[in-house]
Amino acid sequence: DNHLGLTSLKESHDREKIFVKWLDSIKHDAEIIFLLGDLFDFWFEYKEAVPKGFTRSLGKLAELSDMGIKIYFFVGNHDYWMTDYFQKELNIKVFKSPELFIFNSKSFFIGHGDGLGPGDYGYKRMKLILSNPFFIWLFRLIHPDLGIKLGRYLSQKNKLISGSEAVSYTHLRAHETSP
């Protein structure tokens, strides 16, 4: 959960640079990369517009995809409004729900994990509404400048209500890998 776009622009850029550095460090060894959601704090694709920013991450993902590395993106609860941008522009397969993969005769159930466990019925109801095609269609009627601003505001508001916080930059730096 990088939540790019959360907090200040500088903090978001710092997290993004660490993520890109990590991608650089694995590009010669990786065959498949699984991104497990919430790469962005808010992502909503309009038919002709996507949120601005994140150019370092998107460019690096495109580079790795162009190198032949398979990249699978499992949407999280902050970026599940993806349609076809990642597939068309970056050649990244997007999954809206967890999937079973088998590698070397071992099974792996891979996904973001939000709302899979017992309880949290309020979130599960909210997710049904927010992932409803009619609701998404209505939201697309809002101009992207207003819609993206509203989405970011609601994402921040949700964190304040739930007590959820993004991982601090200091925490990320402490766990940064050297290439």
Model-derived features with residue positions:
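Short, well-ordered, mixed-charge alpha-helical segments that flank or form enzyme active sites
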Residues: 80-84, 110-111, 117-120
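Charged/polar, solvent-exposed surface patches and flexible loops
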Residues: 21, 63, 84, 88, ...
